[in-house]
Design a protein with these regions (language model features):
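Short, small/polar residue-rich loop motifs at catalytic or cofactor-binding pockets
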Residues: 38-42
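Short, surface-exposed charged micro-motifs
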Residues: 45
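A short, basic-hydrophobic beta/loop patch
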Residues: 77
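Short beta-strand
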Residues: 33-37, 97
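Conserved "boundary/linchpin" sites in short secondary-structure elements
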Residues: 4, 22-29, 48-66, 80-116
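An anionic, turn-rich surface loop/hairpin at beta-sheet edges
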Residues: 67-73
């Protein structure tokens, strides 16, 4: 699985974005999910605290592609768990750039995760 951090404003370096992508990707596991979920790409948004902790209640699905709504819900649940579990101690984000990453969009694609 792969995730892309979708909407982190320009001043963050490619390395900083990649660090967040890698951190979340380690926890993202669709496991033995349905075939439908395994072909579904979901875009997820999350609000972050200044210390790099995700605000769990803010995690929301913005949209999906490639599968059914049921498959998207399964993929979203896996994405939500990944953000919550790997973000338990905060993500490695530069505090001086908080205004740029306080709202993040991530694209979770079974073929690769990315930031947008």
């Amino acid at each position: 699985p792969y995730a892309r951090v979708a909407q982190v404003m320009g001043a963050m370096t490619a390395g900083e974005k990649d660090g967040l992508r890698v951190a979340v990707s380690r926890c993202w596991n669709l496991g033995s999910s349905s075939t439908d979920a395994l072909r579904t790409t979901v875009t997820v948004a999350v609000s972050m605290d200044a210390n790099g902790l995700p605000q769990i209640g803010s995690i929301r699905m913005l949209g999906y592609e490639g599968g059914t709504e049921a498959g998207a819900q399964i993929a979203f649940a896996a994405a939500r768990r990944a953000i919550a579990n790997c973000g338990r101690e905060g993500f490695p984000l530069p505090p001086e750039k908080y205004d740029e990453w306080k709202e993040i969009e991530m694209v979770f694609n079974p073929e690769g995760m990315r930031l947008r």
